[in-house]
Structure formats: structure tokens, C-alpha cells
Amino acid sequence: MSYNDLVRDQYRQELDGIREAGLFKEERFIKSPQAADIEVEYPAGADSRKVINFCANNYLGLSSHPEVVAAARAGLDDRGYGLSSVRFICGTQDIHRTLENRLTEFLGTEDTLLFPSCMDANAGVFEAVLGDQDIMIADRLVHASIVDGMRLCKAQQDTYKHSNMEHLAEKLQLHQDKRRRLIITDGVFSMDGDLAKLDTICDLAEKYDAMVFVDDSHASGFIGRTGRGTHEHCGVLGRIDILTTTLGKALGGASGGCVSGRAEIVELCRQRARPYLFSNTVAPVIVSGAIRVLELISGSTERRDKLEANTVFWRQGLAAAGFDLKAGDSPIVPVMLYNAKLAQDMSRDLYDEGIYAVGFFFPVVAKGQARIRTQISAGHEQHHLEAGLEAFGKVGRKYGVLGLGKKEIKEKFGL
């Protein structure tokens, strides 16, 4: 079928349906470097304004750090803009292996392999190490990139209820006839901000002869005593078989991801993982900046400690104001609003108050689970947090949601 008027109208009707359902996503144009204070043009064509950013993955405030920028610039001058090649042809510079070795040391694993993104890492790892005689058993709230990666793999699939260890044990028992069992989980769940029970998961893996996979993208650099991740926080360093993470959040915020873990698994990814074999290498400028990031966070926990203090202050302030929050300790603090239109309307009003915090709704989260996901950074100063709490309180009072839970919000606004 050609792209005729009928097809065009069909697509337009689909888009109209998304708008009518209140599920249409808009982009905001940022006209400054990533930071706690940013300049945003919203809506498109409007005059830009300075706002406080509460929705970036810039957990350690390193995205625009002068030393990271300087290292990236030096890498650009020394190693060039790009390599115009995949890794195994002529796309591996010595700095790529340097970064992989630094990540291995920091994460406490045996080896590491860089990918263009963590989504690519998750898309490639399962197919590379599992076959149709194996089983993947995943938490039901794993990241979308994991879901997509599992779809590309020939191994059988099953799920367990979110963070329900009894259900996981049942599934592991059920699948004892499979050749290999792989438990799959996020370290920190990106929408809710809660941490996986990795200590129990590792115990179950040993009991039922399974391997463990963790995507630690929302933890690497700041969760755990020295910021190594959820596996450090849970006391299971050395017990995770496959760990994926990103350079696009706390570790500089640019792009790039990796598979880290058992040496044989990493080598199989080097030989078989299609996103690794058929994608351009991570650019030298990003590699150079990421090496400097690891130097900064390996030498001091100051930023990680500040992030933790900021998170406690922010969470306590929102709770005291009467917002319905998801429980947790991570810098992802979701303000639960349940109704998609309510989340979008409050987000727009917060923007008018100088606060940039985006509403999340289906299909990013399940229907009836809309929220404003706030994210805290070590780059936030006290005045940023206080201004944010004041604006949230003002907008919350306007919509009458303070002190309300899901049942009351549903009665007032519907789902």
C-alpha cells in the first residue's frame, strides 16, 4: 500500500485519539547546558525562561561539570570526532579499553564491554548468552529496554510479581527443568524509585541454580556506600552475573552503555551481540569525558553524599505537604496523581511557577498510575529545593490533591 490520503488520515486519526485521551507527549526545547537551572522554550515558539530542573537523570550534577567538559574537549582534539566504524573493524581506540577497565574496577566485576547505549546493551545481551533451552524470569516492572531485549531472544520467558520474592521462588522451582535460568531485574526501578531486593534474589539464585541480571542505570555512581550501585547497597558485590548500566545518567549524562559481569559472558557479547557488532563505536569525546567522571567519583563520595541529603530533604518536604509518594530512598521521588490529565495540568502550572517537572502517564506507566516523577541532583542547592517545595505546595493546593490518596483522587478526577 502506498502512502496515500487514506493511510495519512488513518495515522492522523490515531494521533487525534492519543490527544483526546490526554496521552499526547510534548517536547520542551532546552536552550542551555543541563544543570539545576536551565533555560526552556515551552510551548514551542514561546519566549524561553529560566526554570529549576527536577526531571533530569543528572544525579551527580556532572553533565556540565567543567572538568568533564574539559576532558571531553581534550578527547575531541586528541582522538577526533568519530571513528566511522564498528568496534571489531577499526573502531576501538586505546581509550575505549581504558574506560572498560575503569568501569570493571568501579563496578566490581570481571570485564566490561561498551555499547552505544544501555538500550543497545539490553537489546543484545540476552540473545548472545541464552538459547531456546533456557528461561528468562523477569520482574514485571523491568525497564522497557529489557522487555524489548527479551523479545529478541529465543529463550523462554516468564515473570514474577514486582519484588515478590515468594513468587520468584515459585517460578524458579517451576523451571528447574530448563538448561539455564536467568533472573532479570532493575537495580532501581525507574518509574517508582524502589530498589530490588538483590540480597534475597542472589540467595534464591544460589538455591535454585540460576544466574542474576541487573540493569543498574538508575544507581551507578550514587547508590551504595561508595556509589558503585545497587549491588553494593545490598551487599552482593561479586554475586551479580550480568550488570548493564549507562553513561547517560549519573556518569556524565551523554550517551553510551555497557554490559559488565562474568568474563565469559562479556566475551560472548563481544562475539555475538548484534547491537555491538553492527553499531558505530562510542565517540571518543564521550569516552574521554566518562573516564574523567569515573576519576571524580572514585576519589570522593562528596557528590553522592550531597545527593543523599538532598533526597531526604525533598522527600520529607513533599510528604509533609501532603502529597501521595511512592515509598523509597532513591533520588527518584514520584508524586502520585493517577489521572493523566491531572498530571499534565499540574506539570504545566509548575512550569508557570518556574519548576520543570514532567507528568508521566500511559504508555510510560500503567493506566491509572500517572504521576509527576521528580528527580533530585547533587547539583541542587538548598534554595532550589525550597523553591520547588513551595511551588509544589501552591499547585497542590490549587488542585486540591494535598492529603489525598488514590481512592480520593479517583473519586475527584477519575482515572
Could you tell me what each predicted segment is?
Residues R8, R12-R79, A210:
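N-terminal "arm"/small-domain region of PLP-dependent enzymes with the aminotransferase-like
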Residues N58, D158, H162-V214:
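Active-site phosphate-binding strand-loop segment of PLP-dependent enzymes
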Residues P66, A70-A74, D78, N101, ...:
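PLP-dependent enzyme catalytic core of the Aspartate aminotransferase-like
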Residues V69-S117:
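Conserved N-terminal alpha-helix of the aminotransferase class I/II PLP-enzyme fold
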Residues V125-A144:
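Conserved PLP-anchoring active-site segment centered on the Schiff-base-forming lysine
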